[in-house]
Amino acid sequence: MKLQEKEVLLFDLDGTLVDSAPDLALAVNRTLKDLNKATFDQDTIHHWVGNGAKVLIERALSGSAIIDKELDETLTKDALTIFLAHYQQCLCIESVLYDDVQEGLLSLKAAGFRLAIITNKPAIFIQPILTGLGIDNLFELLIGGDTLADKKPHPAPLHYAMKQLNVVAEQCVMIGDSKNDILAAKAANIDSVGLTYGYNYGEDINQYGPQWCFDTFNELLISLKR
């Protein structure tokens, strides 16, 4: 099936539609300061994004993408609580939509595509970000990293989306910047689009085998044009 023949577009959020790294970095560093821990530059934190808030904080406390197995559980829990409070206050300070996203989503909706979001970000943050960046009311379904017991790369969020939207895998495509998006799609037998401009831990997303791969959102829009 050609990409433009798909009916449902399942979008990741961070690194796909929104460059949220600046605000995530701000919240992470505010958290680390509160805990009297060393802070990090935005580029470093950028590579820790994509597996949900808990993993992001574990990486920050470890000072590495590889989580310290000796991390104190109580410290991690406290740090996560502090981080979520800070992030709530800075969701859209520096976060921006990637080029062509707002106009592109409007055109896709007008063309008859059904749009949904499947992100590993806590669900409580999704709607405020969409509203703050002017792309609310475009999506039929919003699934966060804590909506279900499992998050990407587990296929459960994608299966849940199909059930809620009353569609089958062949009608859908998962669009994201991370290996988690591609692996989740494969596990759910859904085709996927890899976007190279996002937060894939410095890895080439092509190595995970998406059916399509684009360097810009506009290239995606061109391929979806009916």
UniProtKB/Swiss-Prot annotation:
One of its GO terms (molecular function) is metal ion binding. It is an enzyme of class 3 (hydrolase). Belongs to the HAD-like hydrolase superfamily. CbbY/CbbZ/Gph/YieH family. Signal peptide: none annotated. NCBIfam families: HAD-SF-IA-v1, HAD-SF-IA-v3, PGP_bact, PRK13222.1-2. SUPFAM superfamilies: HAD-like (SSF56784). PANTHER family: PHOSPHOGLYCOLATE PHOSPHATASE. InterPro entries: HAD-like_hydrolase_sf, HAD-like_sf, HAD-SF_hydro_IA, HAD_2, HAD_sf, PGP-like_dom2, PGPase_prok. This is Phosphoglycolate phosphatase. Specifically catalyzes the dephosphorylation of 2-phosphoglycolate. Is involved in the dissimilation of the intracellular 2-phosphoglycolate formed during the DNA repair of 3'-phosphoglycolate ends, a major class of DNA lesions induced by oxidative stress. The keyword Hydrolase applies. The lineage of its organism: Bacteria, Pseudomonadati, Pseudomonadota, Gammaproteobacteria, Alteromonadales. Gene3D superfamilies: HAD superfamily/HAD-like, Putative phosphatase, domain 2. The active site is at residue 12.
